[in-house]
Amino acid sequence: MLFEYIKEIYNLLEETILLSLSYFVNANKRIHILYLLTSMLLAFYVYKKSSIKSSFIKYLFPKKIWLSKSAFVDYSLFFFNSLIKIVLIGPYIIFGFYIAFYTDEFLTVTFGFPKESLGITQTLVLYTIALTILNDLFSYLIHLCMHKLPFLWEFHKIHHSATFLNPLTQYRIHPFELIINNIRSILIFGIVTGIFDYFSAHQIDKLVFLGVNVFHFIFLLLGANLRHSHVKLKYPKFLEYILISPFQHQIHHSNNPKYFGKNMGSKFALWDWMLGTLVLSKSVGRISFGVDKDTSKFDSLLKNLLSPFKTFFYFVKRNLK
C-alpha cells in the first residue's frame, strides 16, 4: 500500500516536471525557445541603443534579478502551477468542446440550419480574428476586476508582488487566479467555436502557424517575454495605442500608485485606450516593482499561497469583534 502511494507521488512529480519542461518546446507557450530567442534579439537592439557599459550577457542576466528571492518564487510557482494544471485543470479542458457542441446544438434547435454557410476561407479568417479579439477583451475585463474588486485583488496581488521581473513571472499567479483564467479560456473557446461551427456547416478551422493561432504567434515573436523583464522595449507611439508594448506592461507592474490599474490589456491596447487606463511609454521614466514595502511578506512559495487567506481571516476576525 505504502509502495503504491509513493509510486503515485513519483509519477505525479515526473508528470509535473515534464509538463514544466514542455513549455520550452510548446509553440503555444510564451517561453518556447523560439520566442525566447526573438526576445533576446530585441533585447540586444535595446542594449545597443542604450549607453550601458557592461557586456550584453551581464545586461541580460544580472544576478540580482535572476537569483533574487522574487525570482525563486516565480520558479516555484511555475512548477507548482504545473502540478495544479495536471490535478485540477487538465481533466476539465475537454469541457471547451462540450460547450462548443451544445452551443451548436442550441443554435440549430432554436433557429434551424443556416440557409447559407460561411466558406472555408471566411471561416478560417473570421474564426481566428473572433477568438483573438474576444479572448483579449475578456482577459482585459477579468484583469480589470482583479484590480478593482478587493476579494480578487488579494489573489492577483501575488503576481504584482514580484520585485524583479523575468519571463517566468508570467506564471507567478495564485492557483485560484489560474483556475479563473482557464475557465475564461474554456468558455470563450467553447462559445465562439460553437457559433462558427454552426455557421460554417462544421468546416471550422483557424489560421495557424506551427500549430499556433497566427495572431498569437506574431504577438509572441514581438518580444512577449520582455514584458516581464528589465529590458525596456518600447513600440512607436502610434503602435502603443493598438498593442501593449513590453515596457507598457512593466509600467503596469510599477509600485507607483500613479500607474496602478493602468495598461491592463493582454495583447491589445485598444481596451485601455477606450476605458482610460492607457499609459504610453514615453510619458514614464524610471520604475520599480512590487506591492508592499515589506517584501518579506511575499518572499516564499508558501507565503504567496497563503497570503489571500490570511488577509480574509484577519478581515473576518476583525469584523466579528
Which sequence ranges carry the predicted segments?
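Short, charged cytosolic
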Residues: 2-9, 45, 49-63, 144-160
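A membrane-cytosol interface segment of integral membrane proteins
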Residues: 282-321
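Specific transmembrane helices
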Residues: 30-109, 127-139
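A transmembrane-helix-recognition feature enriched in membrane-embedded lipid enzymes
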Residues: 79, 266-277, 305-320
